[in-house]
């Protein structure tokens, strides 16, 4: 028996057992969609770092993979993320978006995921995702607060069970002012949005 025949038999037997995987990957002769691998190497490495951090976070790790990718792709493409590293290793990250009034309501009250065209729809700055599975949350918040160009930032806080959400707002009157922290329940935040309209 020749080596090629042995190799063919091995491949045939293996593929029979692994056929479900082959069917899950699409047609091998079809090219990948246009722009499928268009991210620069640095951004692909950053995407991997963010996936790693999410997988290590007890709060984030049960998200479906497709949801994680969908949540990270737009801020990655827009460079609206920051990864915090220690000794070269990723330790935390956050993503942000600038939302208009109606998108704030959809995101914070209706809990609708942001569409890519909504990430820069307005001037209201939101931290969309934040993961610090190694205990660096205090350092991340301190670094965010040091940004004197922003006077107000909002984020959604969910309890561990994911059954309740609150809007947390960091606000200062001017670049040198103290930062006030306000927490809004859903109805309180609706009233706040109505006052701002």
Which stretches of residues belong to each language-model region?
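Conserved beta-strand in the GNAT
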Residues: 83-98
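Short linear motifs in intrinsically disordered
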Residues: 1, 69-75, 143-148
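Cytosolic beta-strand hydrophobic patch enriched in CBS
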Residues: 81-85, 154-156
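Hydrophobic secondary-structure block in the mid-to-C-terminal portion of proteins
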Residues: 171-197
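A short helix-loop-beta-strand connector motif used in the catalytic cores of GNAT acetyltransferases and
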Residues: 70-83, 100-101
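Short amphipathic alpha-helix that is part of the acyltransferase structural core
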Residues: 2-68, 188-197
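Acyl-donor binding region in acyl/amide transferases
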Residues: 101-178
